[in-house]
């Protein structure tokens, strides 16, 4: 019924644990709040069920300036995510003060393929690392009405690479021809 959101300090970083019913706007909301609080994302583990009840489990290693978030900030982030999911907190309005949401990402590459191991449609999104990148990617995914059910993240030499395993609208598998169109559409949405 209600989202489970916990933030714990682990060594020099904070770890956010999240569980809820998966919906296409979820990651947009979560990453929007993290961007609004100026948090850095170091790693992302995401597992989503592909059958009812379609729950998603997320573990994010995050920090503020490379350090553990103060307890008060962690509590505010937790509350903000909860309020955003309930529609009581407009994350876009808060972000518009911090970022130019219309400016694109630099050197965007997108590629669609069907993963032979997971047998799921996958989308590779790569761009130069910059604040708000995750939010912009997840916002574009939401605009396309896609559901992320697994994700891999790699940050290397100033580039961020996300591999997102997806279901299409109505939790359907995405055929190749449509996936290629989606990849192209995402690239346009995200580029300068």
Q: Where does each model-flagged region fall?
A:
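Regulatory modules associated with amino-acid/nitrogen control
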Residues: 1-192
